[in-house]
Amino acid sequence: MSQIEFKNVSKVYPNCHVGLKNINLNIEKGEFAVIVGLSGAGKSTLLRSVNRLHDITSGEIFIQGKSITKAHGKALLKMRRNIGMIFQHFNLVKRSSVLRNVLSGRVGYHPTWKMVLGLFPKEDKIKAMDALERVNILDKYNQRSDELSGGQQQRISIARALCQESEIILADEPVASLDPLTTKQVMDDLRKINQELGITILINLHFVDLAKEYGTRIIGLRDGEVVYDGPASEATDDIFSEIYGRTIKEDEKLGVN
């Protein structure tokens, strides 16, 4: 059984723009799958359809054999609890502490009123501190999040997903706004938790060299369709040119070695 299955998935926006066209994909547990393609190719739409931040128009998406497309109420909340999300612009409460932001990953496990009052049990705080230690910012736990650098804020996002105890992490252009050194640190963190914890990573990346260096699998999208799906080791520059529909520009390669 695949951990994520896209079955005949299509997405048409109200303005009639076609975001996804009949997508059929299976993502296995423990994969580090990278989605690549030009801006507007459907990368974010595909990624965000997994946890239903974007609802699809037709088809069905399954998480560990259960349809998230048809899930509602508590069943949907329980499925989403298993899927962490990392955004390009961090999506943190900037005036809150690092620890409080990481603890927000536990919201799906408790009544809303407890979370509003900040009544997190001791076990949750231990999980949050462990997650911060894993991404090497435990010493920042009591600082305000907006006092940290962009790279450190993205690591808070990763720690939040870990504290959530997600088996799947979706990362939507998580390093697009970071410098090369910080990019390497964040990507190394994602690879480490993928390899050590077996967490499945599905990530959108703009840069070709990052996709090849960190991904185990490349999924190429063009105009909402999958035009390449194979091992990262076999994704040549010619294949990337086919995905992009043109020659790859130097500023789209960006390695981190």
UniProtKB/Swiss-Prot annotation:
Belongs to the ABC transporter superfamily. Phosphonates importer (TC 3.A.1.9.1) family. This is Phosphonates import ATP-binding protein PhnC. The keyword Membrane applies. It is a peripheral membrane protein. ATP binds at residues 37-44. It is found in: Cell membrane. NCBIfam families: ABC_phnC. Keywords: ATP-binding, Cell membrane, Membrane, Nucleotide-binding, Phosphonate transport, Translocase, Transport. It is an enzyme of class 7 (translocase). One of its GO terms (molecular function) is ATP hydrolysis activity. Its EC number is 7.3.2.2. One of its GO terms (cellular component) is plasma membrane. Residues 4-248 form the ABC transporter domain. Part of the ABC transporter complex PhnCDE involved in phosphonates import. Responsible for energy coupling to the transport system. It comes from the Bacteria. Its main location: membrane. It catalyses: phosphonate(out) + ATP + H2O = phosphonate(in) + ADP + phosphate + H(+). It comes from Staphylococcus aureus (strain bovine RF122 / ET3-1). The keyword Cell membrane applies. The complex is composed of two ATP-binding proteins (PhnC), two transmembrane proteins (PhnE) and a solute-binding protein (PhnD).
